[in-house]
């Protein structure tokens, strides 16, 4: 098939690679424009942009698709289908209608649960037991289109957003290749009206840990916000990111360090901190962290 690919971050890269490996003709790659990054604040291409150039593909990065010229340029590609995954721009109706088979979106949830910007984070933070990938026929609404294919996967007990992100990206790549191969036989299924939830964009204000909350909720918060933006607490007045944790046993005053291995009392129950990161430093497993900065039993976070 002649495919227009539309995606921007790391999550999208395996999908582009899978489409190329499957023999599809990539008419063009659309992604967000390069943006300043790093200490020098030099413009840096997005992950999809960089990989597309490696693959010898044409890259386009318009700041908007609302204008008639941008829409005409898109339509002129004569695509059979557009594959959209974490692109970052709203697609006007003229763009949605241009490819012969429309635009297919790869969404990282079991729709209609977790429509919106942060479905992976929200699934973990809510304590969902499973999530998945949906291949959706795009329409004007936010993740409201009918679903062509879906694949379900359990969320593992200590899984972080980062780890689940990588698993779902690989699943999405496999599922879109299957969807394109079976496109003539697939019947889009409208999403049910019941069970709709919205995955709001993560606000950094959600990242500070309140140790008076139950251990289960704090563990979900830490795993759901890892690696970005990273849940955090203060140790001896210094902000420290908490990147991995597990539920543990123990009781004490909320925020109290219960042993020499960073088991922390919560409002109910306790958690063990597994991986931490000081400001300006690399992330470390708890045992290595404690060698450089012992946190005595009885310390209050």
Curated annotation (Swiss-Prot):
Keyword Protein biosynthesis carried by entry: yes
Disulfide cross-links: none
Binding site for (6S)-5,6,7,8-tetrahydrofolate: 109-112
Keyword Protein biosynthesis: yes
Key words of the record: Protein biosynthesis, Transferase
EC number, as in UniProt: 2.1.2.9
GO CC list: cytosol
Any one Gene Ontology molecular-function term assigned to this protein's record: methionyl-tRNA formyltransferase activity
Annotated PANTHER family: METHIONYL-TRNA FORMYLTRANSFERASE, METHIONYL-TRNA FORMYLTRANSFERASE, MITOCHONDRIAL
Family: Belongs to the Fmt family.
Protein name: Methionyl-tRNA formyltransferase
Source organism: Ruegeria pomeroyi (strain ATCC 700808 / DSM 15171 / DSS-3) (Silicibacter pomeroyi)
Gene transcribed to yield this protein: fmt
């Amino acid at each position: 098939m002649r495919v227009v690919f539309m995606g921007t971050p790391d999550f999208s890269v395996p999908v582009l690679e899978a489409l190329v490996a499957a023999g599809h003709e990539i008419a063009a790659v659309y992604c967000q424009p390069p943006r300043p990054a790093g200490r020098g604040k030099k413009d840096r291409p997005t992950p999809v942009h960089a990989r597309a150039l490696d693959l010898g593909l044409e890259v386009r990065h318009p700041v908007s698709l609302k204008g008639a010229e941008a829409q005409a340029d898109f339509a002129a590609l004569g695509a059979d289908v557009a594959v959209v995954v974490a692109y970052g721009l709203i697609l006007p109706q003229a763009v949605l209608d241009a490819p012969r088979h429309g635009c297919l979106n790869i969404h990282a949830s079991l729709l209609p649960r977790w429509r919106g910007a942060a479905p992976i984070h929200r699934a973990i933070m809510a304590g969902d037991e499973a999530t998945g990938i949906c291949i959706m026929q795009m329409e004007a609404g936010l993740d409201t289109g009918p679903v062509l294919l879906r694949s379900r996967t359990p969320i593992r007990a200590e899984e972080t957003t980062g780890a689940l992100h990588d698993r779902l990206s690989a699943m999405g790549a496999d599922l879109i290749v299957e969807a394109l191969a079976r496109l003539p036989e697939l019947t889009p299924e409208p999403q049910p009206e019941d069970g709709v939830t919205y995955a709001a964009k993560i606000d950094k204000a959600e990242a500070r840990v309140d140790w008076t909350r139950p251990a289960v909720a704090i563990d979900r918060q830490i795993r759901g916000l890892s690696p970005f933006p990273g849940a955090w607490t203060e140790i001896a007045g210094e902000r420290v990111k908490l990147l991995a944790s597990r539920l543990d046993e123990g009781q004490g005053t909320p925020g109290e360090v219960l042993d020499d291995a960073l088991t922390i009392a919560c409002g109910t129950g306790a958690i063990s901190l597994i991986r931490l990161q000081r400001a300006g430093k690399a992330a470390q497993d708890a045992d290595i962290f404690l060698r450089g900065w012992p946190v005595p039993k009885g310390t209050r976070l």
